[in-house]
UniProtKB/Swiss-Prot annotation:
Pfam families: GTP_EFTU, GTP_EFTU_D2, GTP_EFTU_D3. PROSITE patterns: G_TR_1, G_TR_2. It is an enzyme of class 3 (hydrolase). It catalyses: GTP + H2O = GDP + phosphate + H(+). Disulfide bonds: none annotated. This is Elongation factor Tu. GO terms for molecular function: GTP binding; GTPase activity; guanosine tetraphosphate binding; translation elongation factor activity. It is found in: Cytoplasm. Residues 136-139 are annotated as: G4.
Length: 394
């Protein structure tokens, strides 16, 4: 059987459902596929198919995630749903499932709960750009004043964590009614998808971002100069363009005099390509793995930052004991490890395996970084944590 070719006729967006346990995230995910299947925009996927999410490994961490895909009139969506709260924390911090936007599911019968707060905070920390709210289980609430109160609470909570709480669309409905095929249930799902279509912005494609390539290897080719290899993370590099070598040492300027892929010479390399880049006048010993090639001025090296981190549990192969202030592990950014010291907030004595925490890191050498950059924490060659840079401290 030939594999169906993925037709990319519509713009693609990655989204996910977030919210408190039992507020109906998985029911909503199933309802979206079932309602959109009626117009041919999805394959109807039952609740139990989504709930039995397969385990995946991302940077040594096991995460259960269900993926469904569907399309509206305007877009193609890849949608992630996680069965457990811990899976969300890991997913958002590792970026295993990149989210361009989220659907926050809140039960109208219960209102915002602790994980509602935690997911909103995490979404802000890891840079989820926008979200839409689905107030679920409205069929269980008879009092319209109560619905209004819950909506106000959710909007206040979103504003508190830096989202535009007053303007975020809030759709009221019942995923269960939609699953049962009731017209009011389906109407709410269609309203929700219209809101997602119009309110969640189209992500900037990787090729439209400034050029950046983490250096994996460096070679010296006699008579031609120094070649660095790696996978282009974003943007496009053209032969003849000026670039900077950033991280670990002082930033150096150089020029790309050749781009090679699979032993063929190209005019340009673009995001996703594994390329060799020839650098004019750069000596082999001036460049090393762990640095990046970048568009001049687009990224700076830093050695102090704040991070949101998930610490692996003992069962996941992490530490067996908590760590305290001044813990000095290795931080693995893109292609290299750099030693750093962890500074915990004043009110935190220690971080337990299986927890997520916010703290400051001071590296012994600067790394090219921007907010949103992912990293692993390693100790003796094994991964003990995963994190994301939330703020750079100069």
């Amino acid at each position: 059987m030939a594999k169906a070719k993925f037709e990319r006729t519509k713009p693609h967006v990655n989204i996910g459902t977030i919210g408190h346990v039992d507020h109906g995230k998985t029911s909503l995910t199933a309802a979206i596929t079932i309602v959109l299947a009626k117009t041919g925009g999805a394959k109807a996927t039952a609740y139990d198919q989504i709930d039995a999410a397969p385990e995946e490994k991302e940077r040594g961490i096991t995460i259960s995630t269900a993926h469904v895909e569907y399309e509206t009139k305007n877009r193609h969506y890849a949608h992630v749903d996680c069965p457990g709260h811990a899976d969300y924390v890991k997913n958002m911090i590792t970026g295993a499932a990149q989210m361009d936007g989220a659907i926050l599911v809140v039960s109208a019968a219960d209102g915002p709960m602790p994980q509602t707060r935690e997911h909103i905070l995490l979404a802000k920390q890891v840079g989820v750009p926008a979200m839409v709210v689905f107030l679920n289980k409205v069929d269980m609430v008879d009092d319209p004043d109560l619905l209004e109160l819950v909506e106000m609470e959710v909007r206040e909570l979103l504003s508190k964590y830096g989202f535009p709480g007053d303007e975020i669309p809030v759709i009221k409905g019942s995923a269960l009614q939609a699953l049962e095929g009731k017209p009011e249930g389906e109407k709410a799902i269609n309203e929700l998808m219209d809101a997602v279509d119009s309110y969640i912005p189209q992500p900037v494609r990787a090729t439209d971002k400034p050029f950046l390539m983490p250096i994996e290897d460096v070679f010296s080719i006699s008579g031609r100069g120094t070649v660095v290899t790696g996978r282009v993370e974003s943007g496009i590099i053209k032969v003849g363009e000026e670039i900077e070598i950033v991280g670990l040492k002082d930033t150096q300027k150089t020029t790309c005099t050749g781009v090679e892929m699979f032993r063929k010479l190209l005019d340009e390399g673009q995001s996703g390509d594994n390329v060799g880049i020839l650098l004019r006048g750069t000596k082999r010993e001036e460049v090393e793995r762990g640095q990046v090639l970048a568009k001049p001025g687009s990224i700076k090296p830093h050695d102090k930052f704040e991070a949101e981190v998930y610490v692996l549990s003992k069962e996941e192969g992490g530490r067996h004991t908590p760590f305290t202030n001044d813990y000095r592990p290795q931080f693995y950014f893109r292609t290299t490890d750099v030693t750093g010291t962890i500074k915990l907030p004043f009110d935190k004595q220690m971080v337990m395996p299986g927890d997520n925490a916010t703290f400051t890191v001071e590296l012994i050498k600067p790394i090219a970084m921007q907010e949103g950059l992912k990293f692993s924490i390693r100790e003796g060659g094994r991964t003990v944590g995963a994190g994301v840079v939330t703020k750079i401290n100069n």
